[in-house]
Amino acid sequence: MHTKFFLTRGIVWIAVISLLLSACAAAAPKTVATEVREEVVKTVEVYEVEAPAAVQQDRPAYEPTAAPAPSTNQFEDYGVNPYTAAVEDHLSTFALDVDTASYSVMRRYLEDGSLPPAESVRVEEYVNYFDQGYPTPPEVAFGIYADGAPSPFDHDGTHLLRIGIQGYEIPEWERKPAVLTFVIDVSGSMDRENRLGLVKRSLEMLVERLTAKDTVSIVVYGSNARTVLEPTPGNEHYQIQAVIDSLHPEDATNAEAGLRLGYQLAMQAFQPGYSNRVILCSDGVANVGNTGPDAILEQVRGYVSEGIYLTTVGFGMGNFNDVLMERLANDGNGNYAYVDTLDEAEKLFVEDLTSTLQVIARDAKVQVDFNPEVVARYRLIGYENRAVADQDFRNDAVDAGELGAGHSATAIYAVQFNPDAEGRIATIQLRWEDPDTYEVHEINGNFNTWDLDSSFETTDPRYQLAILAAYYAEVLRQSPWAADVTLDELYSLAKPLLHSLPEDEAVAEFVQLVGRAARIAH
């Protein structure tokens, strides 16, 4: 049973807050009152969410796999967040992240017959890979949603909270014109596994979606960098694709020179009010010039501040540099994806094209203010390398995350309560900068003990998916907080999702991947 609160209206109408409390398919979301702040939206709406109908599906089949050859892939271990006593630190602050590369990297490892390295796993990228089913906020920028239930893995009263941010959607035909600069790695390493061939086919999918209002330029780099296509109208598909088709692998890898020239070309073609973006396609290998992310970023930082965004797209495995690609995206005001199949390329460049190209929020960050009278301790599962100092939540000079149109971002918290405590669990606050007006907005809302579900089994299937994805990542990265959770247990819990979310191909693949990981682990 969910309690309704009175609507609180503020002075400036900017956005909507709603906390989605899905106890079961029939449960109605709660209306939430928000604290009045001068720059904050103060209106509340109620949304209805229905669970998909169940259908019968067979268990997915798995093929025997062989162990892969040793590799020189580069990943970084960011550690695992500990529990924090709410009485000692009641604030949890992090930059939003919509990257999904870590999940795709895992899939590639499983296809090659081995579990992914623990350091390659970033929990939030597993969770954010999936559609969370949040309602799109009507005629406003963002909605905040939350739900929670007892953990299916712990029997000590631990509850798992899902906190979601959903941005407004823009139809593809209404998106801003895009000024795109492709920076393509044509070094010798891109000849392996036909990496360059996958780059070509991926970019061709993107080019087919462009129109006369868009502009495309292309820079390639091996030992040196050069421009192979000057700014060209996006509807010149044949000309653009002919240049892409003509590319072939060359020698060493000077990523610094490629990005520097790419940004220079992007700046020359820059159009105020357009989506100005550099798209880097590479395996991340850099062995000529400056090779580290800090040194490379130093060469292009000025262009980033001018409003040129960066998308890094990783290809290949065996000598893949995940560290470089992620750091470039994080510090380049962008996003990071890994393409291992044409299906993944279609997801990035066709299905999510507007989300990929058009930014609706800059420096977006979340602060969760836990109530020490109710919460004994809490743990943010993931976002280890996206932490923001609590005192910097309202410091708008601190870099945070960018969200594209229709993007959502989700965080999972493990929470333990004080005995018999009831009331407000936390206040969830979102702060972001409008990329067009540069105005800073902030919205917030409360989540309470009476909003919790009584059991994991009766929660919304999308909540269950988010929790299972998070714990799948926890097991793969060997988190001490999931030491007693097995892949077999996760597979058993995941199988019902085939019936509750029958139309979602990503869910079916997830169940299959969990089963495959369990087989490999035996």
Annotate the PLM regions.
Residues 115-132:
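Extracytoplasmic
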Residues 62-109, 114-120, 138-143, 153-161, ...:
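An acidic, Ser/Thr-enriched
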Residues 1-70:
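Intrinsically disordered, low-complexity Ser/Thr/Pro-rich tracts
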Residues 28, 143-364, 418-422, 435-437, ...:
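Exposed acidic/Ser/Thr-rich ligand/metal-binding surfaces
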Residues 128-133, 145-149:
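Periplasmic polypeptide-binding modules associated with outer-membrane biogenesis and secretion
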Residues 23, 98, 282:
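Residues that line or immediately flank small-molecule/substrate-binding pockets and catalytic motifs
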Residues 124, 197-200, 466:
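Short, well-ordered alpha-helical segments
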Residues 126, 130, 240-244, 349, ...:
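Generic structural signal of hydrophobic/aromatic residues within well-ordered alpha-helices
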